[in-house]
């Protein structure tokens, strides 16, 4: 059991360390500071609806950066995201999806990299694992789950439903 908790704790600590460069520290803060053109679409965006444009580029940079999945220049933090994806879905071939989408993101301007990666990744076989990974780390960073909490799909889904219902109903 200790052998499973230690890598999880180390990964979560790394994710928290990476997300410290921004003013925002949680997805909630990114949503609070969302560009005006997206303010009325927060509920839609929380359901993983890809949106194009500079405002969404900025928002996804914020979200993925506070989660520790991209650097402040939009570059993918490959091992961090892969580690969470493997916790969520140990059997998935997430690395190939990540490589494909990272290659797409490398073709665009720095300001669009995070959103390009996000949009691409939602079209891969790893999309569900990615959604769970984002939700799981969002809950950890927001203090809704304790740092040592191992991934549980039912628990993550229930907590995200509570948050979404509170915001969107």
Swiss-Prot record:
Serotonin binds at residues 31, 59, 118, 135, 138. Female saliva (at protein level). Female salivary gland. Low-level expression in female carcass without salivary glands. Not detected in male tissues. One of its GO terms (cellular component) is extracellular space. GO terms for molecular function: odorant binding. Disulfide bonds join 30-62, 43-168, 101-120. Keywords: Disulfide bond, Secreted, Signal, Vasoactive, Vasodilator. It is found in: Secreted. Noradrenaline binds at residues 31, 46, 135, 138. Gene3D superfamilies: Pheromone/general odorant binding protein domain. Transmembrane segments: none annotated. GO terms for biological process: vasodilation. SMART domains: PhBP. Histamine binds at residues 118, 135, 138. The keyword Acyltransferase does not apply. Modulates blood feeding of female mosquitoes on vertebrate species by binding and sequestering different mediators involved in the host response. Binds serotonin, noradrenaline, histamine and adrenaline. Inhibits histamine-, serotonin- and noradrenaline-induced smooth muscle contraction. Exhibits vasodilating activity. This is Short form salivary protein D7R3. It comes from Anopheles gambiae (African malaria mosquito).
């Amino acid at each position: 059991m200790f052998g499973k908790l230690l890598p999880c704790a180390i990964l979560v600590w790394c994710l928290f360390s990476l997300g410290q460069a921004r003013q925002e520290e949680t997805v909630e803060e990114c949503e609070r500071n969302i560009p005006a053109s997206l303010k009325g679409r927060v509920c839609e965006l929380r359901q993983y609806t890809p949106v194009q444009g500079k405002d969404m580029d900025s928002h996804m940079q914020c979200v993925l950066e506070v989660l520790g999945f991209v650097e402040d220049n939009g570059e993918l933090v490959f091992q961090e995201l892969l580690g969470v994806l493997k916790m969520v879905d140990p059997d998935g071939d997430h690395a190939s999806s990540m490589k494909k989408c990272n290659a797409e993101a490398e073709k665009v301007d720095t300001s669009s990299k995070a959103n390009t990666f996000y949009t691409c990744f939602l079209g891969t076989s790893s999309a569900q694992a990615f959604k769970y990974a984002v939700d799981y780390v969002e809950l950890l960073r927001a203090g809704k789950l304790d740092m040592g909490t191992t991934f549980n799909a039912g628990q993550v889904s229930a907590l995200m439903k509570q948050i979404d219902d509170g915001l969107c109903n």
